[in-house]
Amino acid sequence: MNVMRRLKSIASGRTSISSDPGGDYALKRAKLDQENDNLCVDPMQVDQNSSCFEMKADVLSQESVAGTSNVPAVSEKPVDDQLPDVMIEMKIRDERNANREDKDMETTVVNGSGTETGQVITTTVGGRDGKPKQTISYMAQRVVGTGSFGVVFQAKCLETGEQVAIKKVLQDKRYKNRELQIMRLQDHPNVVRLRHSFFSTTDKDELYLNLVLEYVPETVYRASKHYTKMNQHMPIIFVQLYTYQICRALNYLHRVVGVCHRDIKPQNLLVNPQTHQLKICDFGSAKMLVPGEPNISYICSRYYRAPELIFGATEYTNAIDMWSGGCVMAELLLGQPLFPGESGIDQLVEIIKILGTPTREEIRCMNPNYTEFKFPQIKAHPWHKIFHKRMPPEAVDLVSRLLQYSPNLRCTALEACAHPFFDDLRDPNVSLPNGRALPPLFNFTAQELAGASTELRQRLIPAHCQGTGSSS
């Protein structure tokens, strides 16, 4: 059934919208899970025999842009900076120095690609500013994610025994890697940490960038799927914790780093299953959005793609991340994606089924250049009918504030952090179900709170944390 016939059927009342927003979601879920099994190893599990680290393997949509590549996408300006000759000649960079200056390192990759089990990759760090050279060796343990971007493998540092994840991507020698440049700027408890990076070559003289990342043993996707398989809903405390940390990380990215992630989805949200600290990963699609400068609209995995992207907007804002965050929150509450479209247009149908037909003004806010307006008039489906009757009203309210057609009406990340839905987290007596203390939630830096009103600050930081500079 084409998009117009489907919308007309919904408008006429022939197609109902039940508590299963996707309608035939079970079939779509089965197809999705099969794609997961075929395209990528499952995200990391808690048990030691099956733990893995899922990154950019986009199993939700073949339409998603794998922006990790250094080759600029169509209509998006390339990163013009040329790589220094020393990098082309296989000198490597150490990202751990405080002043962001580059340090040369040499790398050796023994026979093979460096990703086979047991393969050892040796790099030499230091050798500048009077500091001695230090050899670091990583033993590849398993490939845990593949995609058009390259490969991610789990490795062990032989000197320290530390587990890391190494993301290996083909490097275009003409350009700097945008993902690397962005990750070098970041330092936040809810953003995956870049330990350092190095370059390696193959027998075909191909240059690869290797990002050495901290290892986090779970994903929100896997955690959610765990409860779905048991026919249970994720405990509300975990929905609160994960959503809050997503919003806090997005506030940091948007306001401090000045970056839009552009691919927020459960697979890109890492979680420590013991502490429940969340970290956003995979900055292969991330970009600093410049007002007036066009960007590609074919970005973000489909289920989490903001409507302005579907309408072809090229001058969008960080609000696309807030839409994606709202979709993730709704999915955790429902146990399934809220908008499970099977194509770009089908995605719009799923959104309209719940939000109703966008008004002309809403379409103008999403894309001023979009003039076509032929959609049947469909009324918005009440949010309280989408979720279970016992769902906290604060949860429903926050979802509704994030999933607005007009990007400028969506609450900002910092405003979301102050929402009453998270008041339970601000209770000094609250703890994790396992008895542990909550992960750091309120240790905001001055940069994170820059521009926030006194009232907002008071709502953000609970009384028992104010003036202490410490987190819960």
Swiss-Prot record:
The entry's keywords: ATP-binding, Kinase, Nucleotide-binding, Phosphoprotein, Serine/threonine-protein kinase, Transferase
Catalytic activity of the protein: L-seryl-[protein] + ATP = O-phospho-L-seryl-[protein] + ADP + H(+); L-threonyl-[protein] + ATP = O-phospho-L-threonyl-[protein] + ADP + H(+)
Protein kinase domain sequence ranges: 138-423
PTM annotation, UniProt: Autophosphorylated mainly on threonine and serine residues.
Enzyme class at the top of the EC tree: transferase
Active site: 263
Entry's transmembrane regions: none
Family: Belongs to the protein kinase superfamily. CMGC Ser/Thr protein kinase family. GSK-3 subfamily.
Name the record gives this protein: Shaggy-related protein kinase theta
Organism field: Arabidopsis thaliana (Mouse-ear cress)
